[in-house]
């Protein structure tokens, strides 16, 4: 549920206790836990797609991708070893392999 | 959170590791920059030097199906502040 | 007092069933709702994306997808989407 960005440092203990159930609830947080390290398709509101390995993301939906391909209208237009995508541009993150 | 292959735990780590390196920045309005990254903040405001800007001028009028390419304009700037809300993507140099 | 249902309660009751999502732009999604958060970011499964472009309509099939709540305009519970009226 909590979609706020993680605290910048780990000096203080986390304020909230862990969620009571670790089972799959289907929440956005659970989805993201399952999809980190997997191949994903990130579509921006502009319609441009980025396909790559999801390294990590934060509460703003800022995304770090590895082995990234940029697709415009189904055509590869760029490749990046790493890419930081600013979250406000993100329309969706879709799993491109089984979670 | 899990880190896959690298020492990256949050997306901003990617930017932090690119400080003093030449980066590629994709901006709204079909603009692209390459330059040395000197500083950034949580908004993705950037300070870059030795920048080359590439502006893609998409001529949609002449090609009714859209995506009519285009004309490319380039220019250079010594030092630049980039407002974070225009940033779409930042790509650091390849890590080894 | 008449019993009132909060908007997000309605969406909560949709979890597990199909939902039609209409974005602020010319873009729509249908899929099975797995969950959502306070921002109405939504996790959908077996998703169809519908785009209306100058070149015509385009659909894309997607597996499990996290849809950013920022650009959502309307939600229609239990609907199969723009193809047939549910």
Curated annotation (Swiss-Prot), chain A:
It is found in: Cytoplasm; Nucleus. Keywords: Cytoplasm, mRNA processing, mRNA splicing, Nucleus, Ribonucleoprotein, RNA-binding, rRNA processing, Spliceosome, tRNA processing. GO terms for biological process: maturation of SSU-rRNA; mRNA splicing, via spliceosome; tRNA processing. Its main location: cytoplasm. Residues 1-21 have a biased composition (Pro residues). GO terms for cellular component: nucleolus; P-body; sno(s)RNA-containing ribonucleoprotein complex; spliceosomal complex; U4/U6 x U5 tri-snRNP complex; U6 snRNP. Disulfide bonds: none annotated. Residues 1-30 are annotated as: Disordered. GO terms for molecular function: RNA binding. Pfam families: LSM. Residues 27-99 form the Sm domain. Belongs to the snRNP Sm proteins family. SmF/LSm6 subfamily. Component of LSm protein complexes, which are involved in RNA processing and may function in a chaperone-like manner, facilitating the efficient association of RNA processing factors with their substrates. Component of the cytoplasmic LSM1-LSM7 complex, which is thought to be involved in mRNA degradation by activating the decapping step in the 5'-to-3' mRNA decay pathway. Component of the nuclear LSM2-LSM8 complex, which is involved in splicing of nuclear mRNAs. Component of the heptameric LSM1-LSM7 complex, which consists of LSM1, LSM2, LSM3, LSM4, LSM5, LSM6 and LSM7. Component of the heptameric LSM2-LSM8 complex, which consists of LSM2, LSM3, LSM4, LSM5, LSM6, LSM7 and LSM8. The LSm subunits form a seven-membered ring structure with a doughnut shape. This is U6 snRNA-associated Sm-like protein LSm6. The lineage of its organism: Eukaryota, Fungi, Dikarya, Basidiomycota, Agaricomycotina.
């Amino acid at each position: 549920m909590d979609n706020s960005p993680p605290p910048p440092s780990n000096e203080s203990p986390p304020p909230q206790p862990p969620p009571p159930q670790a089972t799959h609830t289907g929440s956005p947080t659970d989805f993201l836990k399952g999809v980190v390290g997997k191949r994903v398709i990130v579509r921006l509101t502009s319609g441009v797609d980025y396909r790559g390995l999801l390294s990590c993301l934060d509460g703003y939906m800022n995304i770090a991708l590895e082995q990234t391909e940029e697709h415009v209208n189904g055509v590869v237009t760029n490749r990046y070893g790493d890419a930081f995508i600013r979250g406000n541009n993100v329309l969706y993150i879709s799993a491109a392999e089984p979670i | 959170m899990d880190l896959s292959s690298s020492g990256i735990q949050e997306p901003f780590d990617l930017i932090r590791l690119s400080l003093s390196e030449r980066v590629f920045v994709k901006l709204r309005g079909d603009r692209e920059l390459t330059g040395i990254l000197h500083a950034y903040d949580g908004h993705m405001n950037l300070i870059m030097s030795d920048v080359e800007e590439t502006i893609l001028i998409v001529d949609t009028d002449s090609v009714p199906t859209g995506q009519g390419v285009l004309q490319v304009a380039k220019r250079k700037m010594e030092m630049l502040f980039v407002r974070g809300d225009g940033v779409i993507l930042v790509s650091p140099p390849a890590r080894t | 007092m008449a019993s009132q249902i909060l908007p997000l309660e309605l969406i909560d009751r949709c979890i597990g069933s199909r939902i039609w999502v209409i974005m602020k732009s010319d873009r729509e999604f249908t899929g099975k709702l797995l969950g959502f958060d306070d921002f109405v970011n939504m996790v959908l499964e077996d998703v169809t994306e519908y785009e209306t472009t100058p070149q015509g309509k385009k659909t894309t099939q997607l597996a499990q997808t996290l849809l950013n709540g920022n650009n959502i305009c309307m939600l229609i519970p239990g609907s199969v989407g723009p193809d047939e009226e549910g």
